[in-house]
Design a protein with these regions (language model features):
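Bacterial N-terminal signal peptides that target proteins for export
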Residues: 1-8
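A glycine-rich, hydrophobic loop/mini-helix early in the fold
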Residues: 13
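N-terminal signal peptide c-region/cleavage motif recognized by signal peptidases
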Residues: 16-19
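Conserved, well-structured ligand/cofactor-binding cores
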Residues: 21-175
């Protein structure tokens, strides 16, 4: 009997905690919902949105495996867009994936400078919510784990410190 009461209590608490959760699906985020997330509302991701993210990611990997040039994955970014970073040769081996990780780490380090006052955390949460919802459209080719991490960070109150001048752009951090 105690277990049943505890389970019912846990379900009630979980339901109450998620009663005000905003479900993101990549299609219809309202200003009201976006500001609710900025103020601390938790988020959930609609399953169909994660399916789109997975399909998009699979498409990018298939293109890379077939020797297609993929911006930021098989070729550089910015002025290095014409520079081949790695060759998939029909297969994304552990070596190719490691080379891609090294490239991305190097890119992040080269962009890791910023200045100015720190952006209000609510505005950062707002930007994170909008970015997550955009990723859920399924057009970016991003790894599904990136979308999951955005949701986890929002739900756990993990908010990056973002200086207002010279910060890295969102397109530089999604692949």
């Amino acid at each position: 009997m105690k277990t049943l009461k505890l389970s019912a209590c846990a379900i009630a608490i979980f339901t109450a905690m998620n009663a005000n959760a905003v479900e993101l699906n990549g299609k219809n985020l309202t200003q009201q919902d976006a500001w609710a997330i900025a103020e601390g509302a938790p988020v959930t991701i609609a399953p169909e949105a994660m399916n789109r993210v997975q399909k998009s990611y699979d498409l990018v990997l298939d293109a890379a495996k077939n020797g297609r040039e993929i911006y930021g994955l098989t070729v550089g970014v910015g002025l290095n867009k014409d520079h081949k970073v790695l060759s998939a040769n029909g297969e994304l081996s552990d070596e190719v994936k490691a080379a891609s990780r090294r490239f991305n780490y190097s890119t992040l380090r080269s962009h890791s400078i910023a200045a100015g006052p720190i952006l209000d955390p609510k505005l950062v949460r707002l930007a994170m919510a909008i970015r997550l919802n955009t990723l859920l459209n399924g057009g970016s080719g991003v790894q599904p784990r990136v979308a999951e991490l955005y949701a986890e960070f929002l739900n756990k109150g993990v908010t990056p410190v973002i200086p207002t001048k010279g910060s890295l752009g969102d397109a530089d951090i999604t692949l």
